[in-house]
């Protein structure tokens, strides 16, 4: 009986660790997919920069694409990844020497996976960088 109790405790610990590890990888894979889709969207969209407000509105649309899968989500739309918020998506533009965007970086910062036996925090990962292939429109405004 003692052997059964000891081996059952070890087996339960191994099983629960495997479940937590698998769930964390499942969430991470969802984050990778969302960040990749948002990065591709950002790389192909029109970069409008008539005012600083236009740049920030463009970044908000990219963050919404990562979180909700839509640049303009409807009321009540839930996130693609559990508990992901637009504030946890960082969008940075790399500019060339003439001031035009050359690449876009999309990163997750401060996201916590609330697994069964602990919390795992992702900051700076996953991240993607795509070259900018969209249209540069410095005189246009976001709508």
Across the structure, where does each feature detected by a protein language model lie?
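N-terminal single-pass transmembrane signal-anchor helix
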Residues: 1-23
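Active-site-proximal flexible loops/turns
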Residues: 10, 27, 44
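Membrane-proximal amphipathic alpha-helices
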Residues: 24-32
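Short, conserved structural patches
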Residues: 33, 37-143
